[in-house]
């Protein structure tokens, strides 16, 4: 019997390291990636390189899983590719984790605009905004709302903080090139840059939320939260990890709404009055999932062992704990 983690984010390594000591010796751990990433795949018992083409990859995964008696396939970053083929995996006796239980929920999670609309309809506090598709629309939306709100912008489709910028008027236009990690850009420079694109991607202009930011990593099963760790992201770059917090209760409502399944991550931020608003749910493990191990609550093990129908070992958890992310390195072998 085996468990297979397909290509994910960089946190695929953290998941493999969390799983290996918790699996019985007769459960083989497999990993794969489209690129040569030995620092990730060497953490598994067996590793493969995935085909580049999506359609080819799905059939290759299904065939390979059957050949090696793999009972659980975790789709990683490409849940939308595998979800339409769930019935084929189930027919082969293989459990499939994609982040949700149907393709439409995955598509709605991927669209910040549709995600916000569904949350609003369900009465869930969410960071909503205005979709723009060209420079003229962007300029009009900014002009209509800049007096009432500090504004920010991000792609309608994207993961985590990719493409997020705050719109600031009283700022040197060149500052965004000197300190890009500040994520601040002059309003006019952004409008000019967006207008210059021949095929601009849809963007979401939103009121900027100035309050505390949280991230919640969760084990979910068909819309039910099984275990969760909330991470309070502090200004000094440290994070406070908690097993109990009101933002987890907020996350439960969103998970139920979108029938989340597997390990997913919710991001939220407070407004000036302290009210938390959901920013997004990423239907895959976050880049910070490895930090949660400092609580001794092994989310990866809980997720996989429950799927395999195996008992969960007792975990001597700690909460709250404070961590600070570091940059480190590992030796890797060269490609053959």
Describe these PLM feature segments.
Residues 1-32, 66-77, 131, 173-179, ...:
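Preference for protein termini
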